[in-house]
Amino acid sequence: MISSNDFRPGVSIVLDGSVWRVIDFLHVKPGKGSAFVRTTLKNVQSGKVLEKTFRAGETVPQATLEKITMQHTYKEGDEFVFMDMESYEEGRLSAAQIGDRVKYLKEGMEVNVIRWGEQVLEVELANSVVLEVIQTDPGVKGDTATGGTKPAIVETGATVMVPLFISQGERIKIDTRDDKYLGRE
């Protein structure tokens, strides 16, 4: 159990049978009446955002999350096969369980799998990945009227906006959180 006074961004709680992560909180102490904590919560499974107010000192169950380091070994049909780096056991996850970051997942890549009990809540990739550009238009000298970027398709199939000087076959670094080009590798 965790007190609402101990809420901080990133704390996970159980509310109505599902896991919610505290995104933002504000401890309010009005002149009249009792203090309360206004929170913004995000459902870890669905991504739904909720604003909820708790009385100061109110206790709620804290979610005990387990973080496991796994390596993506191969893809079989619609499932991705991962190997636990400690026990060497295999596990399978669907693209829906991995989420939108599946477009940066490559064989041999290590990820952190966040579990609540036996249920997989999310898969965390590294903040940046290095991938090879497999298709992009050639940059034309002096063509900067469009802001100096062009679309490029990387080896995993994801499309990323890159500067005009990037050519096919180059390895680039991409931020997986906001799909931005970070530089050449």
Swiss-Prot record:
Source organism (scientific name): Nostoc sp. (strain PCC 7120 / SAG 25.82 / UTEX 2576)
Gene that encodes it: efp
UniProt keyword annotations, A-Z: Cytoplasm, Elongation factor, Protein biosynthesis
PROSITE patterns reported in the protein's UniProt record: EFP (PS01275)
Gene3D superfamilies (alphabetical): 2.30.30.30, Nucleic acid-binding proteins
Any one GO MF annotation of this record: translation elongation factor activity
Signal peptide annotation: none
InterPro entries hit by this protein: Elong-fact-P_C (IPR015365), NA-bd_OB-fold (IPR012340), Rib_uL2_dom2 (IPR014722), Transl_elong_fac_P/YeiP (IPR020599), Transl_elong_KOW-like (IPR013185), Transl_elong_P/YeiP_cen (IPR001059), Transl_elong_P/YeiP_CS (IPR013852), Transl_elongation_fac_P (IPR011768)
The protein's name: Elongation factor P
